[in-house]
């Protein structure tokens, strides 16, 4: 297997030497043991053994120094070792990693666990993220060595457990061999302590079993003193040891030792009290002081603009720009939110907010509104949202309503729904919102649904028609063009009126034959222009009405259709019988669109068609003609000599 190599940064390695207190430069072909104290594998310590290649075979410096893996285990006890985290070593040794197979364990690569060795005590088996990076053969080798180390650790634990049990047995034996004065010899050693041993005021020696009574009679408790039954218990306790040297007065009695320390029980004499260990409590590092974070107020003000000069407009201004502020500078804490708001307001008198007022954007806006208006805006929220919708759009009104009502979906939807630009938007939004599983999901997806509906209907982000600025002029020019074509066609073909056909309706009011229908058509055109310009609606229904399920009635269009039907009946009674079928087709198209717009595409028929075929064509294609009549934007001039049966 080819040795693993990589580029070497000599300067970074020299800096690493200086950081570790090594006052020399790296040498050519120097073997270094790398001790990595944590890396991508986890907190465990891993090793690798590399050699430095600084010169070529002729002794010339290499253009790019290299390092090479030695392929043997590293032993920090006898090798020159660099100890650093894996990330720091990668600065000098490009693409360095742990050793292959069991070489990553360094001194434990052969599976020999040494009790008490510092490198053995820090051993940690591979974690999951390290195992997943191993090949099959490498994994089997690593598991074999880890198994050996684990077995040795288990054996060591068993030996230490046996030693502990032996020491406990010796302790029980020593405690059982210490009799108490005035009490019979204790029973065989047991696990429970004898309470009499601690309650006796004196401690007697422990002679051998055959001579126990004789020793007690000859030695006595004090020199020439009475027996233990006549002693005053208030006297100091004395411990006597027959193995210590005493005065040779021939009596064999031990002298009194009033200054000797008292012995309460044999257990403290065998096990001295351990000093109390201090309680170590982990203290979390203090959090980052928010005051140390620099707020990019210029970037935020470039997005939001300057604060309004009128203090009453400040709360709504903050609510409209809350999302923009979060997009420029994410705000994790209330302290930073209060600092941002105070910086945007320029420390205006009476509007400075504290962190407890800025837990959320809603609380901050509510506090500002109370300070500027004197009351919480819930009672006039509908009017506030209407003004915001007129200036910023329904999406901004929705977001502001959500913040001011603490995510009350039903309340805000009831206020925003009448602000949507038309019945089609209301119906589409209601259909999309009904498909959501909960009110929380509806709140989150409301703006996305609204933008999708606006895009579908050809509206901008504020619900206005994309052609609102040029819609009125375009319609006026189109109407004027159709009227001019009607006049030119009548002047150029005088025989068309003599054939018993009526002139076009809705464009020439001077003829006097259809005054009411023409006026109705002009009024509808004016209503369309006014509705498109003022309401900013869409092309499908310029003047919508609220359906009955939302609280409305039949609406204006039902009355207009009834009036147009009466006008059509009067106009048909004044026209010749030959005009009936063509007039019905034209008036049906006018009933669906503005009154007076004729089906002009019939003028495009060829000159060779006779009257019968023209009538049949009008009858067969009445549906298509009605659809084309709704467009009302045909600019193809009428063909000369063609039958004008429907006109």
From Swiss-Prot:
InterPro entries in the record: Gag_C, Gag_N
Ranges where the record places region GR-box 2: 536-557
Region entry GR-box 3, spans: 581-613
Further details from the record: Foamy viruses are distinct from other retroviruses in many respects. Their protease is active as an uncleaved Pro-Pol protein. Mature particles do not include the usual processed retroviral structural protein (MA, CA and NC), but instead contain two large Gag proteins. Their functional nucleic acid appears to be either RNA or dsDNA (up to 20% of extracellular particles), because they probably proceed either to an early (before integration) or late reverse transcription (after assembly). Foamy viruses have the ability to retrotranspose intracellularly with high efficiency.
Site (described: Cleavage): 301-302, 329-330, 342-343, 616-617
Leader sequence residues: none
UniProt-recorded name of the protein: Gag polyprotein
Recorded GO MF terms: DNA binding; RNA binding
Name of encoding gene: gag
